[in-house]
Amino acid sequence: MFDPASFVKEIGPQLKQKVGNERVLAAVSGGVDSTTAAVLAYNLLGNKVIPVLIDTGFLRKNEAEKIKAYLSNVLPNLIVVDERETFTSEIEGMEEAEAKRKKFRELFYSSISSLMRKFNAKYLMQGTIAADWVETQGGIKTQHNVLVQIGIDTEKEWGFTLIEPLADLYKNEVRELARYLKLPKEISERQPFPGPGLLVRTIGKLTREKLEVVREANDIVEKYLDPFNYSQYFAVSFESDGNFVILDGIDAFLYKARATGVKGDVRAYGNIAKVECSDINAAKSFVDTLVKYDITHVLCSLDERSNGKYSIAIRAVITEDFMTADYARIPKEVLEKISSEILQKIPNVKEVLYDVTSKPPATIEFE
């Protein structure tokens, strides 16, 4: 059983010996992993640690301001760096999931490298955890913060040395450590948020319009699902065009947009399928049939209108370790409220759907 006190006692001398009198830049996303790593380092090393939040333009609505407020007591020297235009303009128009993730990684570490020079820091502290490098090494998806584990020499590539104190921990253990370090519950209990943020929830080609659509939709989804304490819950957006097919007697609509999955422990990049289903609790039978084909995510139709060009898919999962996950059985009336508000408040949304695919064969995020 994981004991956070023992972990801190063991890691403390190691960190102090490694860092010596050098400065450490701690990359903070506002998620539980990176923030826990930064607070751990700050508690052990004091003002040698410079925590930095890069606003990439892919954060949730008003997130940078919220994170700074949440962390005012535990990371009082947190610096927010506005890189929204740089990231958005460089990735705008890119379509393939892995290409977008890799471009994000390139931009992120280029920005980090500049900050390292600015603050004369030798070490970069990251919140990489076990699930991150397992997925990247397995070729399922590129986690932007996994570097050393896949043979990237950060000293040669960007001129800094990496410190990853949480690299052998899983999400539930990181939460225990966060509580032990007295992080505010808004951080210790918050659901995971990917490093590339809403970039990987803007499925297919990145456009500014689609990015803002998913930012608003995600805000609505979180508002309604916060009270349920699901492991992770969010919205994704993609273009609504595609075509109808019949697969093993099941009527389905296949979108042109594609999404990441994991089949046989390897990455799959397949179709997103929509079906009509009266009961999301009884979805397993047709999901099992459809994912035998080139399909990674199966969605149930919730509500739609005649005009609009974007589909919004709601994703909510329950999991212990994020290596496997089951979709949440959200009450029908809650899904109806979410769908209604999204269609009412966000222009250009044609339909709202619910993802009824477990992990595997889907990944939790679509990209």
UniProtKB/Swiss-Prot annotation:
List the Gene Ontology MF annotations in alphabetical order.
ATP binding; GMP synthase activity
Recorded superkingdom: Archaea
Membrane-spanning intervals of the chain? none
Instruction: Enumerate the catalysed reactions.
Output: XMP + L-glutamine + ATP + H2O = GMP + L-glutamate + AMP + diphosphate + 2 H(+)
Stated EC number for the protein is 6.3.5.2
Q: Which UniProt keywords apply?
A: ATP-binding, GMP biosynthesis, Ligase, Nucleotide-binding, Purine biosynthesis
Question: Which pathway does the record list?
Answer: Purine metabolism; GMP biosynthesis; GMP from XMP (L-Gln route): step 1/1
What is the name attached to this protein's record? GMP synthase [glutamine-hydrolyzing] subunit B
**Can you supply one Gene Ontology CC term for this chain's record?**
cytosol
* Function comment: Catalyzes the synthesis of GMP from XMP.
